[in-house]
Amino acid sequence: MIIPIRCFTCGKPLGHLYAVFKRRVLAGEHPGRVLDDLGVTRYCCRRTLMAHVEWIDDVLLYERRS
């Protein structure tokens, strides 16, 4: 799993928040409220967490050719 460690725009550390954010959103909480509770107030940081897509499992299905 490759998660964003820092915000792409401002550089604020976000890696420690991603697991909590994902767990709470999958449990049915509103993403905006979760981000507010975690103290993520900047638009750039909110975008980084909300727009992240875990694609590593899909990429691993393809074989590498020499």
Swiss-Prot record:
It catalyses: RNA(n) + a ribonucleoside 5'-triphosphate = RNA(n+1) + diphosphate. Its cofactor is Zn(2+). One of its GO terms (cellular component) is cytoplasm. One of its GO terms (molecular function) is DNA-directed RNA polymerase activity. It is an enzyme of class 2 (transferase). It is found in: Cytoplasm. Zn(2+) binds at C7, C10, C44, C45. Signal peptide: none annotated. Pfam families: RNA_pol_N. One of its GO terms (biological process) is DNA-templated transcription. InterPro entries: RNA_pol_su_RPB10 (IPR023580), RNA_pol_suN_Zn-BS (IPR020789), RPABC5/Rpb10 (IPR000268). It comes from the Archaea. Binds 1 zinc ion. The keyword Transmembrane does not apply. Its EC number is 2.7.7.6. Part of the RNA polymerase complex. Belongs to the archaeal Rpo10/eukaryotic RPB10 RNA polymerase subunit family. HAMAP family: RNApol_arch_Rpo10. DNA-dependent RNA polymerase (RNAP) catalyzes the transcription of DNA into RNA using the four ribonucleoside triphosphates as substrates. This is DNA-directed RNA polymerase subunit Rpo10. It comes from Pyrobaculum aerophilum (strain ATCC 51768 / DSM 7523 / JCM 9630 / CIP 104966 / NBRC 100827 / IM2).
